[in-house]
Each structure stands twice: as structure tokens, then as C-alpha cells.
Swiss-Prot record:
One of its GO terms (biological process) is gamma-aminobutyric acid metabolic process. The keyword Transferase applies. Substrate binds at Y156, G322, R417. It comes from Pseudomonas aeruginosa (strain ATCC 15692 / DSM 22644 / CIP 104116 / JCM 14847 / LMG 12228 / 1C / PRS 101 / PAO1). The gene is spuC. This is Putrescine--pyruvate aminotransferase. GO terms for molecular function: adenosylmethionine-8-amino-7-oxononanoate transaminase activity; pyridoxal phosphate binding; transaminase activity. Its EC number is 2.6.1.113. Pfam families: Aminotran_3. It catalyses: putrescine + pyruvate = 4-aminobutanal + L-alanine. Pyridoxal 5'-phosphate binds at D262.
Amino acid sequence: MNSQITNAKTREWQALSRDHHLPPFTDYKQLNEKGARIITKAEGVYIWDSEGNKILDAMAGLWCVNVGYGREELVQAATRQMRELPFYNLFFQTAHPPVVELAKAIADVAPEGMNHVFFTGSGSEANDTVLRMVRHYWATKGQPQKKVVIGRWNGYHGSTVAGVSLGGMKALHEQGDFPIPGIVHIAQPYWYGEGGDMSPDEFGVWAAEQLEKKILEVGEENVAAFIAEPIQGAGGVIVPPDTYWPKIREILAKYDILFIADEVICGFGRTGEWFGSQYYGNAPDLMPIAKGLTSGYIPMGGVVVRDEIVEVLNQGGEFYHGFTYSGHPVAAAVALENIRILREEKIIEKVKAETAPYLQKRWQELADHPLVGEARGVGMVAALELVKNKKTRERFTDKGVGMLCREHCFRNGLIMRAVGDTMIISPPLVIDPSQIDELITLARKCLDQTAAAVLA
């Protein structure tokens, strides 16, 4: 893959980016020195940059493009809706056909008893919404003191003020004095990195027990909810030990608090079930959703809400919350078509029965690499821990090993994401076995090149 810029348009676009664009999660000085990578088109599981390089996108954009790139049906759904009703708001007791039909379509695949949806423009907005909603719920029940939400360290729930607070990423907290009051955190179920001498099962129970300790510390009478991703995504694809979620369910059953399962990444097939909560057998009260809802073709998010919660909200008067683009008709039309594709083409069933088992089998083959301390994954998400010493799990003192590996990936025509020194993937659900083979071959090549630089 050519890493030299040969296209004059690339330089022009890079200059425009440098002079006018402030992209998210970016060191601007570093980017301006290097120049942005310009992505120009996509098809299936591949993207192309402005230099003509073909790249296997093993991150599905940003955990989003479940049905793959280039689905003309989604383009046509947006086109039809733009002609008929390009926009109308949902304020002032109005609705439109796409949004009510979409709410029903989501209810049809959601966990049992979750039949209502509040729509937003993103996953971050969805997590803002759950904070507002759970506090309004408890106030309506006559318990307004139940305001505290318990999250997990290294969890990710978006980057709005509420989202970054609910999440537990300390680097994000340091920019802006977060979390906001009323949000506290407990340990994450990260056995490889934090389990010490405990077995995975022992650590899973220990990590879950931290929830009960925090409830008792804060006082059950003050706790509104516990929020967690079924599998932590941006934190490094943290797959909890088998004992973790059963123990969490046991604790939640003892206390009068709500459970928020953040399904922004796991939702719409990523685990081989429609939702990660179904994969783990959990029964949340609220589920933030986004990303795979539209396969990233257009921004949209939402919160799926349990019927018992809605019954209380119905008694609470006006819910003073919403967004201009809540339930945007074009986004709703695209989401409806996206769900139709997932259902009619049985994409999630194929993930569960065929492609996910094959991906995880091939992924585990990378565990023998001298740079890999652990290979883990579920469904269509997976991670590799890059370590200096496999036996002792000793980390590299230079924190840039993951980013070095990521750069090798780009040069070799593969997108993997680096979370510190953990390499993660989340490919489109439509990836086929031959493309999985290509992914693994490229990943091993990139690991070899990284190891040559850091293990010499």
C-alpha cells in the first residue's frame, strides 16, 4: 500500500482540513503536522482513500456499519423520505409514519417487555436522555432523592457532559472537571488487566460485588440506576468473565434501582443476538441505542424503555426533554430499512451460526504471536492485548505500541483501532469467511512488523 501522497486533491483536502476543520478526539497540532487521511468511497467491508488505496474496514466505521457499505436500499429509503417529508419535529403532540413504525419495529426485536422508544440523534444524546429519564422516574414515584447513577471505570457512554460523566474514562474526566455531581463509578470487569492472581470466575464475582458495596456506601435510598455496556467497547472490548453478569443480576434483584444497558455498540446484531442483553440473559429497564440502528448511514439514536417505567412516566406530566432532530423522518426511514435488511437477509442469524464462530476461531490463532498476551472476543467484536512479556503480562513502558501497530495496519490495507496497547476490531456483520481470512492474514503481518520494531 502506497504511503506517499501522489494525488493533488489529497493535499488540497488536507489543507482544507488543517485550515478549517476541528475533528473529534484529535491532537490538532499532531494532525496538522501529519495531514488527515482522506476517505473517499466504500463498498461492502472495504473503504478507499484519496490515494486509491483499498482498505479492509475491520471497525465498521466506528462500530456502526452492520449491513456493510453501499446498500442502495438505504439510499433509496432516504431519497423517498426526503421527497415526501424531509423534516418535521416531534414536539407539540405530533408524530409521523416513519418514527412510529420504527418504534414498533424496534419493540419487535427488543427484549421482552420493552415496547417504547424515545428517539435521539446519537448514542451520546441517548445517554443524556437516560440520566434525565431515570431521575424524572424516581421523582414521579415520590423518591426525588434517588439521583445517583453508578457507572464503571473505563466505561464509555458518549462525550456530552452527561455521557462523559456516566462513562469512567479518566482522561476525558480531566478535561472539564468531570464527572458532574451524582455520578459515581466502580471497577470494570477487566480480568486480563486487573484480575491479579484471581481466576476469571473469582474476579468476575469480585468485580460484580463492587456494585453492592457502592450501593451500600451511597445508600440504596439515593441510588437511581446502574449503567453498563454488556461488553465494554471503547474501553478495549472488555469481555466480562462468565460469573460477572449472573452476580450483577443477583445484586440488582436485591435493591430498588434501575438497570441501564448501554447497547449503542452491542445492539443490532454485534453479539449474534439483536442486543447484548439478550446474549447475556439480562433484563434492563432502559437501553440506549444508536450506531447499528441505521448502520451509520445517517445519525440516529434512542432509548428503549421497559413498560413498567413508561407506566410511571405516564403519571409524571410533561417530560421536559427532547431534541430538534429526535426521530428525524429520514433517519427513521433509513433505520426501518436497515432493520428490514437485517431481518429478511437473516444477517444476525448468520453471524451467530457461521461468521462469528469462524471469526473467533481465526482470531484465537493470533494468541500464539510473541506480541499477543491475550486474544478475546464475542460475536463480531474482538481484541488483542499487546505486551512485552506474555508470561508476566508486562506492559510496554512506551505507550505508543498500539498506535504503531495501527499505523502498520493502515499501511497494509487494514483498519484496526488502538486502545492504548490493545488492538480491537468490530467488522461489518456481513463480512464473509474469505474476508475474515484476509483480515487475519493482514493482522498477523502488522503484528510481525510491530514486533520487529519493539521486541528487538
